[in-house]
UniProtKB/Swiss-Prot annotation:
Name of this protein: Discoidin, CUB and LCCL domain-containing protein 2
Cytoplasmic side: 545-769
Organism, as annotated: Mus musculus
Record key words, sorted: Disulfide bond, Glycoprotein, Membrane, Phosphoprotein, Signal, Transmembrane, Transmembrane helix
Top-rank taxon, per record: Eukaryota
Length: 769
């Protein structure tokens, strides 16, 4: 049929598994611009007219015809076509005609990615014509020419058939054209030359036509890291495995900030080159079905991997070497699987235990520098039962798909299945190899569910040379392939295929979109283990919290409850139980303010001293004799012990002429504060007679005043006959208090308080304490 002719143009005749060079047949018939010059004086338009007449005679062949056809892929829904030698200058006196057909009832949309045809003769000899229909009944849509012509508007046909005619005469410049087409409902059609710079949105979806694997284009990057912004979108989509070169398809693009470096890799017959810093990059949104299926991770067990034969031999050191099927695990150290025989009937088979969705395959060679073996081309077969096998083909193509393999012994090469394979068994059949058949494999895909199941590939019946009839059937009962144990004799190098001179270096291809699929047991363990860990952790936390709460409750019940204590009084009592700071015994004498003490009677003072221990003299606890350090009556320095503030023991306003703390006297001789002398022997309420006591430090030559118990406190008189006063006395007083009124032998102010006033003062003093 004529609809298959474009595929013949896109795929030249080739050997087993050899990659096709686009439009090789058309290029072979191309006359050079300089090899066949026109005779002098003859009309230069005579040759194109003869070629046009030849095309009319060959119309029944369909597809593309002529010597002016360039890169061409005409698919059932979309395609791409270029003039010969594009993007370089097309030759003189060439002609090409393309016949495009889509499904009946559909219309065709044509869009130009580049148009550069010389118009020096006003489209007389150099032009491009588009017709509705095919054959003699076709009608012209338009005739186009011009250098750098911007054809932003697409051209639409009236029916499902279109003819495109390119004609060139004598010209000096012009690249020709590149055009893409699709059915009319693909409104977001783009051409194979579009890049992200043609779009302003950070995310968008477009339709790529078939045939965007351009021989002259270049991409940089890989999936999933991203592609450089200069890369053509559709060609990068073929490399990533999201669209097919034969079918085209929809792509979803996400633009992000660029990176300083872009990796190189080989995938789907597209080699991406190393790229450097760019302003932006783009990635593809995919279904996520690109995880590894278990060859590398070990989810696929050794008995599930079989082969037609295995290479086993004993080397000159007597060591046995076995390159069996289970060694064909990608990225596993050690030797690969290698076939004992070297023919096209060898295979490596993988059993997935159940049907899965297989979207790709990654292969590598022997990975051993001393054994440079690899498979350069192979077929892929699939089966549901391991008995009836189907060779993978692309939709609409009546030939087996030959996948490009490795070009060296250590680089990974990825190939994607578009559409994906739904099967349990996968078999790899090498058709070309270097020296020996040796490879490591990993399958890409995901779990398959019956909901939304894709139809299986059902290519047309094969002829008599079907691989199914010539390939050994696997022994599923034993689960192992036959082994050959005889010693391998070295073969001469002239019997081996010649290694290609040109090699393409590709880095490791990483497909990390989806985690590897696992079996039911592994999936069950992956669910149960986290649940058990969380349950045990919760139980331990509950026990720890209960133990902590119980201990805290016990401590709370045993603690002292002091809600009614006054904070200042409680702290003063606690200070007596704490060791005092060691201070120098020879402190500077201080003046002690007795303005408030003068208002207290002997009974009141005795009560206060019984309720609150002395501030400056610490009693001995439990009758133990010890040395108590002296307390200082100086005003504490600011900033020192900021967290502690000692309350005023009298807690009453002071007269303005005095300080809140005792201040040192500016005298040379030693002075001491007036002692507080108590005579408890005559107190009516006292049950035990107490001698007179003093809480102040004695002179330096006297024994320490606080050695022993409270029964040995010192006292002294208020006599001041010497030239220097030994105790501080108030100045400016008019009269002194009588001994009958006060027990303390201290100076008093001129104004005496009445008995009622003193009682009120003492009540306020007790309330503050």
């Amino acid at each position: 049929m004529a609809s298959r002719a474009p595929l013949r143009a896109a795929r030249s005749p080739q050997g087993p598994g050899g990659p096709a060079a686009p439009a090789a047949t058309g290029r072979a018939a191309l006359p050079s611009a300089g090899c066949c010059p026109l005779p002098p004086g003859r009309n230069s338009s005579s040759r194109p007219r003869l070629l046009l007449l030849l095309l009319l005679l060959l119309q029944d062949a369909g597809g593309q015809q002529g010597d002016g056809c360039g890169h061409t892929v005409l698919g059932p829904e979309s395609g791409t076509l270029t003039s010969i030698n594009y993007p370089h200058t097309y030759p003189n006196s060439t002609v090409c005609e393309w016949e495009i057909r889509v499904r009946t009832g559909e219309r065709i949309r044509i869009k130009f990615g580049d148009f550069d045809i010389e118009d020096s003769d006003y489209c007389h000899l150099n032009y491009l014509k588009i017709f509705n229909g095919i054959g003699v009944s076709r009608t012209e849509i338009g005739k186009y020419c011009g250098l750098g012509l911007q054809m932003n508007q697409s051209i639409e046909s009236k029916g499902s058939e279109v003819t495109v005619l390119f004609m060139s005469g004598t010209h000096a410049a012009g690249r020709g054209f590149l055009a893409s087409y699709s059915v009319i409902d693909k409104e977001d059609l783009i051409t194979c030359l579009d890049t992200v710079s043609n779009f302003l949105e950070p995310e968008f979806s477009k339709y790529c036509p078939a045939g965007c694997l351009l021989p002259f284009a270049e991409i940089s990057g890989t999936i999933p890291h991203g592609y450089r912004d200069s890369s053509p979108l559709c060609m990068a989509g073929i490399h990533a495995g999201v669209v097919s070169n034969v079918l085209g398809g929809q792509i979803s693009i996400v633009i992000s900030k660029g990176t300083p470096y872009y990796e190189s890799s080989l995938a789907n017959n597209v080699t991406s080159t190393v790229g450097y810093l760019s302003a932006s990059l783009f990635t593809f949104k995919t279904s996520g079905c690109y995880g590894t299926l278990g060859m590398e991770s070990g989810v696929i067990a050794d008995p599930q991997i079989t082969a037609s034969s295995a290479l086993e031999w004993t080397d000159h050191m007597g060591q046995e070497n076995s390159w069996t099927a289970e060694k064909a695990r990608l990225r596993k150290p050690g030797p690969p699987w290698a076939a004992f025989a070297t023919d096209e009937h060898q295979w490596l088979q993988i059993d997935l235990n159940k049907e899965k969705k297989i979207t790709g395959i990654v292969t590598t060679g022997s990975t051993m520098i001393e054994h440079s073996y690899y498979v350069s081309a192979y077929r892929v077969l699939y089966s549901d039962d391991g008995q009836r096998w189907t060779v993978y083909r692309e939709p609409g193509v009546d030939q087996d798909k030959i996948f490009q393999g490795n070009k060296d012994y250590h680089k990974d090469v990825r190939n994607n299945f578009l559409p994906p394979i739904i099967a349990r068994f996968i078999r790899v059949n090498p058709v070309q190899w270097q020296q020996k058949i040796a490879m490591k494999v990993e399958l890409l895909g995901c779990q398959f569910t019956l909901k939304g199941r894709l139809p299986k590939l059902t290519p047309p019946p094969r002829n008599g040379n079907n691989l199914r009839n010539t390939t050994a059937r696997p022994k599923l009962g034993k689960g192992r392939a036959p082994k050959f144990t005889q010693v391998l004799q070295p073969r001469s190098r002239n019997e081996l295929p010649v290694q290609p001179a040109e090699t393409t270096t590709t880095p490791d291809i990483k497909n990390t979109t989806v985690t590897p699929s696992v079996t039911k047991d592994v999936a069950l363990a992956a669910v149960l283990v986290p649940v058990l860990v969380m349950a045990l952790t919760t139980l331990i936390l509950i026990l720890v919290c209960a133990w902590h709460w119980r201990n805290r409750k016990k401590k709370t019940e045993g603690a002292y409850d002091l809600p009614h204590w006054d904070r200042a009084g409680w702290w003063k009592g606690m200070k007596q139980l704490l060791p005092a700071k060691s201070v120098d015994h020879e402190e500077t004498p201080v003046r002690y303010s007795t303005s408030e003490v003068s208002h207290l009677s002997a009974r009141e003072v005795t009560t206060v001293l019984q309720a609150d221990s002395a501030e400056y003299a610490q009693p001995l606890v439990g009758g133990i004799v010890g040395t108590l350090h002296q307390r200082s009556t100086f005003k504490p320095e600011e900033g020192k012990e900021a967290g502690y503030a000692d309350l005023d023991p009298y807690n009453s306003p002071m007269q303005e002429v005095y300080h809140a703390y005792a201040e040192p006297l500016p005298v040379t001789g030693p002075e001491y504060a007036t002692p507080i002398v108590m005579d408890m022997s005559g107190h009516p309420t006292a049950s035990v007679g107490l001698p007179s006591t003093s809480t102040f430090k004695t002179a330096g030559t006297q024994p320490h005043a606080l050695v022993g118990t409270y029964n040995t406190l010192l006292s002294r008189t208020d006599s001041c006959s010497s030239g220097q006063a030994q105790y501080d006395t108030p100045k400016g007083g008019k009269s002194a208090a009588t001994p009958e009124e006060l027990v303390y032998q201290v100076p008093q102010s001129t104004q005496e308080l009445s008995g009622a006033g003193r009682d009120e003062k003492f009540d306020a003093f007790k309330e503050i304490l």
